[in-house]
Amino acid sequence: MEEAKSQSLEEDFEGQATHTGPKGVINDWRKFKLESQDSDSIPPSKKEILRQMSSPQSRNGKDSKERVSRKMSIQEYELIHKEKEDENCLRKYRRQCMQDMHQKLSFGPRYGFVYELETGKQFLETIEKELKITTIVVHIYEDGIKGCDALNSSLTCLAAEYPIVKFCKIKASNTGAGDRFSLDVLPTLLIYKGGELISNFISVAEQFAEEFFAGDVESFLNEYGLLPEREVHVLEHTKIEEEDVE
């Protein structure tokens, strides 16, 4: 009965001259897995089949032109089938992890541009009423002050690349606390989260070269861990990971 089942599962295997190649290593591994089971429960006829499947076959001139027909045992079939199931489970698990990561980064409101705050009241409401998970970057500036225009342009670019971060700007004279933001401390960057000030940089333009751009500001903020991972990078990483699994 067992032999009849084995005959229904047939597959052709190339004869191998050595165990040093990848197929030889796989055959050795399968042999080890099968031999680790209770050998007393395997009929002699099936043992011979397993021995042939895990042992290299020598070739003469005639055999090199022919394929050697071998019978696959039920045990090896189940072993291979389990390997494929494990690979599929791993692929699904990693894909789910990547989707969860992307969902977390995409959760909450999206902005995408720099908000102009007109009054001190708007300034306070923006800080106090946003979700606690939202990072708020506020640029305190005045027209004609060195570095303010370049910083506004840089933040406009970053707002498009980090849509889950809220970028704002307000003139120092409109904050209601102009005495605290004198011209010599501009441009100033204030970063809030959960209604709390987590970082502030006065005269921030001094941290950059004479001419600076969005990439310079991005690198500066990343040094302090103030920006999340860009979504485009997450999507590219997800695609690469899925290709690696496949």
From Swiss-Prot:
| Compositional bias of kind Basic and acidic residues | 60-69
Residue ranges under compositional bias (Acidic residues)? 1-14
- Where's the Phosducin domain? 1-244
Q: Which residues carry this modification: Phosphoserine?
A: 73
Q: Which GO terms describe its molecular function?
A: phospholipase inhibitor activity
Q: Which InterPro entries match?
A: Phosducin, Phosducin-like_reg, Phosducin_N_dom_sf, Phosducin_thioredoxin-like_dom, Thioredoxin-like_sf
Q: From the record, what ranges are coiled-coil?
A: none
Q: Name one GO cellular component term.
A: cytosol
**What segment(s) does the record annotate as region Disordered?**
1-70
Q: Which Gene3D superfamilies match?
A: Glutaredoxin, Phosducin, domain 2
List S-S links within the chain: none
Instruction: List locations, semicolon-separated.
Output: Cytoplasm, Cytosol; Nucleus; Cell projection, Cilium, Photoreceptor outer segment; Photoreceptor inner segment
Modified how: Light-induced changes in cyclic nucleotide levels modulate the phosphorylation of this protein by cAMP kinase.
GO annotations under biological process? G protein-coupled receptor signaling pathway; phototransduction; regulation of G protein-coupled receptor signaling pathway; visual perception
At the top level, the lineage of the source is Eukaryota
Specify where the region named Thioredoxin fold lies, as residue ranges: 111-246
| Protein keywords | Cell projection, Cilium, Cytoplasm, Nucleus, Phosphoprotein, Sensory transduction, Vision
Q: Does the keyword Oxidoreductase apply?
A: no
PANTHER family under this entry?
Answer: PHOSDUCIN, PHOSDUCIN-LIKE PROTEIN
**Which family, according to the similarity comment?**
Belongs to the phosducin family.
Assembly, per entry: Forms a complex with the beta and gamma subunits of the GTP-binding protein, transducin. Interacts with CRX.
What this chain does, per the record?
Answer: May participate in the regulation of visual phototransduction or in the integration of photoreceptor metabolism. Inhibits the transcriptional activation activity of the cone-rod homeobox CRX.
- State the name under which the record lists this protein: Phosducin
Species, as recorded: Homo sapiens
Q: Which gene is transcribed and translated to give this protein?
A: PDC
